[in-house]
Amino acid sequence: MKIIVDMMGGDNAPLAVLEGAAAAVKEYDVRLIGVGDEALVRKTAADNNISLDGIELVNCTEAIEMCDEPARAIRTKKDSSIVVGLNMLKEGKGDAFVSAGSTGALHVGASLIVRTLRGIKRPALATMVPAKNKAYLLLDCGANVECRPEMLAAFAVMGSCYVNKVEGRTSPSVALANNGAEESKGTPMLKEAHQLLKTIPGIRFVGNIEPRDVPNGDVDVVVCDGFTGNVILKLTEGVAKMLLGMLKGMFLKNLGGKLAYLLLKDSVSDLKHQMDSEEYGGAPFLGAKQPVIKAHGSSKAKGIKNAIRQAKICVENDLCGTMQAALDELNTTKE
């Protein structure tokens, strides 16, 4: 198995990408193809005593910046690490692609270069979100701001396949994000989507879920349009950061708080670990013909390593093939 890694993507590239890639080679027994400025990558590796064993380097002369317009960048920056990496994936030179670079460019590139599964026009961006009982898969979380009911149905099918194959959960539950639990709630589009989701074979649709209940982690997959998903994701991140900050302030406020921290530090450490998004790797573009994983732009070595692990699991379990079979069944049912 070969996984292609964008060495230039993210706020901490190339050092964090190198550290994560080297750790993945040791821990997961994978071969990597690092795409980027080869001279810079080699110098960074040498300066930080990072082994390049198991990492083949492919030189690129360009990089897509976060400020670049995504579609234009994909068309014009042909020798950028994202475009070169996605083309290598399409040509079968690797089995999956991992990048912490521009989300927009990756979405456009996954659609136009790697192409999409039958029945999918644009991939959905999905991410595992920490929650009280268990992490849940949220999709779409930003790639498709407006969605039709048929798109949400496809998201539900792909999300169910992902949680089953990658997270190892049998018969995952699927819920539709809405402003009320009743079938009568929501916009006309959401009402239609609800009725459609009830008819899909092969998924366990449990109905609508209100935003206040999403953080409980009672369901495995939460389906929504990209606008709603992005709001849920960023609000969750903000609240988590706020709560951890308040907790820290409480412990540091006085001697009693400091003593309480000494008694509870293991529990606090467990909580921080549970809420750490880097533990879950990256966000897959579900619907692309081959696995494309978007690591967080601020990913450190652990986040990159886990995104590579995530890509490896997708390949080993033939996630894209499984999703295509499920989508074909969905389209046959609709006909």
Task: List each language-model region with its residue ranges.
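N-terminal phosphate-binding or glycine-rich loops at protein starts, especially the Walker A/P-loop
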Residues: 1-42
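Short, glycine-rich nucleotide/cofactor-binding loops
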Residues: 5-14, 143-153, 294-301
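Short beta-strand segments
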Residues: 6, 34-36, 58, 99-101, ...
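Short glycine/serine/threonine-rich phosphate/pyrophosphate-binding segments
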Residues: 13-17, 79-92, 96-110, 117, ...
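Glycine-rich phosphate/diphosphate-binding loop of Rossmann-like nucleotide-binding domains
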Residues: 15-16, 31-33, 39-42, 145-207, ...
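Phosphate/nucleotide-donor binding subsite
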Residues: 50-94
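Glycine-rich phosphate/nucleotide-binding loop
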Residues: 111-124, 128-138, 218-222, 226-335
